[in-house]
Amino acid sequence: MRVFVAGGSGVLGRRVVTRLLEAGHDVTASARSDTAAELLTRLGARPSRLDLFDVAGLRNAVAGCDAALRLTTKIPPLMKMRRAAAWRETGRLRNQGARALAEACVAEGVQVLIHESVSFVYADGGEAWLDEDSPVDDGGAMPLREALSGEANARVVTAAGGRGIVLRYGGFYAADSAQSRTMADLLQRRRLALLGPSNNYFASIYADDAAAATVAALRAPAGVYNVADNNPLRLGDYMSALAEAVGARAPRRLPAMLGPVVMGETWKYLPRSQRVSSRRLHDATGWTPSVPDARAGWRLIAAQWAE
């Protein structure tokens, strides 16, 4: 297949590009900088410097492609996530950028569009497993509102006769993720605390497994699919797993009343219990994560950091 990847140099994107190339696909990927272009070239992909909001430029990029993947995000640094303004660029990429890519795909006859979304959009599920038909709720949080509205762009391709596929990923963790590194550093310095209830489920996904799921989704029917570890951990266990992996003490506990002050915008959804199931994607493609849960995943990451 000929594949265009928007966002091919990020934590997820570079893993997806590598897997696509290993599978024998012809890959072109967008690059925002010379450094990103050099990385993509080293991987074996063709870098494309273009405006991700320009339909005409995107039409040229996807012309002749069988599939396009929108993996573009600009997640703010961990310490800035509390501010709604920090999410504006990601919101633009999830909506205006995604709309431009969807329009380009329809105009050029690209049959498959994969759109990156997040599993945080689900309402609190308590102890229940959440599938793709479970209720969603943006909670008044801009990141979730933009994520849900952005998903409509995949349906544009489906309506035109192609396959629009939305992947709702759990929170990524990876050795080369700045966010993962920051979390570990803050824990080791006793500057990262556990706010509110610790028994709520937290959906996460090891980045390598997220990439494998993304490539597998190329053969999935149109629709929405969750991408998460098979065994979601409760938030307290998730944080303890990271602490144990990096040799830190368990995080301090702070009362929930401090959540809005400390977490800001993200407090509108992070305390939810989200026991997310990826069975639908497994049934459609055979994909299964290689890392069963974040406890095993953080141990792998800590070992990579120690090398």
Which residues make up each language-model segment?
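NAD(P)H-binding glycine-rich loop region in Rossmannoid oxidoreductase-like domains
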Residues: 32-96, 100, 104
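Conserved Rossmann-fold NAD(P)-dependent oxidoreductase catalytic core, especially the SDR/UDP-sugar
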Residues: 87-89, 96-141
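Substrate-positioning beta->alpha
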Residues: 146-149, 177-184, 195-216, 223
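Amphipathic terminal alpha-helices
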Residues: 292-307
